[in-house]
Amino acid sequence: MLDVHKDIKKIFHEEQVLAEAAARYGFSKDQVRFLADAENYVYECMKDNQPYILKITHTIRRSSDYMMGEMEWLRHLAIGGISVAKPLPSLNGKDVEAVPDGNGGSFLLRVYEKAPGQKVDESDWNETLFYELGRYTGSMHSLTKSYKLSNPAFKRQEWDEEEQLKLRKYVPEDQIKVFQQADSLMNELRRLPKSQDNYGLVHADLHHGNFNWDHGKITAFDFDDIGYNWFVNDISILLYNVLWYPVVPYDDKAAFTEEFMTHFMKGYWEENELDPAWLMIIPDFLRLRHMLIYGLLHQMFDLNTIGEEEKEMLAGFRRDIENGTPITAFDFSALV
């Protein structure tokens, strides 16, 4: 999880910005509860006795137009019948409100409905959930095929424009083998075909911290990372996330991969057609995600002050990347 940018922390005057947010969205300043400061400052606020989620970031990190790309896609999904945490417009009818910081930049505010239900727990971690996740992801991919940008300025990034994949910017320059492996894999992936049936705007960070489970129904939130990608990479990212930190620990990674993917794809194929041959590329996309997380960890950590545990974790990632180690030993041809 990314920490709020240190340059943003320096200029964030919480009380001022929250007062402005309350005025622009019409909620009570006294009923604002701090939740988190990861990629955004996140608060819960009340309006008409309904809870909403307020997210605050800064133009250092995102432009207002870039966020409009998220808001517009969310509305497209909601109109198509997918349960998402929808944006709430401000009293001025805006999806993104800008509060000047006095230094030429702005704090950007947006408010969302609070997703019904709860985070999944151990009792929910079973084939029903995996199947419903498949249906949910398949529905998003099916709907994204009909999405049209209303304004080219709102366009989200392509898969290879991801900041954390710029490994040379964050990883020590002597890790030549890491860069070679990343370049080689990304060049290979760039040759994959792209069409409306396999590539489009996707969530790109689905995991059990980003949706609520309400009596068998999923509502996703946190669409901060949406971008253009192959549908199979969106599936791979979710798989990487459930392998990385499962709600219920597994003994055998390959066996769990088989269990998860079997039920997930059953649900997925009910909602979206995707040529099964694409599943054979999942191991490559899992390795790509491993590289992205390696970049993210270097972006987060100060290598001069990290402890032994973090050093060991980075060393493990480096070994995996340099040796091209598969993330899971499962043979994906079993699903095809």
From Swiss-Prot:
GO terms for molecular function: homoserine kinase activity. Signal peptide: none annotated. Keywords: Antibiotic resistance, Kinase, Transferase. The keyword Kinase applies. It comes from the Bacteria. One of its GO terms (biological process) is response to antibiotic. Phosphorylates the antibiotic amicoumacin A (Ami), leading to its inactivation. Mediates natural B.subtilis resistance to the drug. This is Amicoumacin kinase.
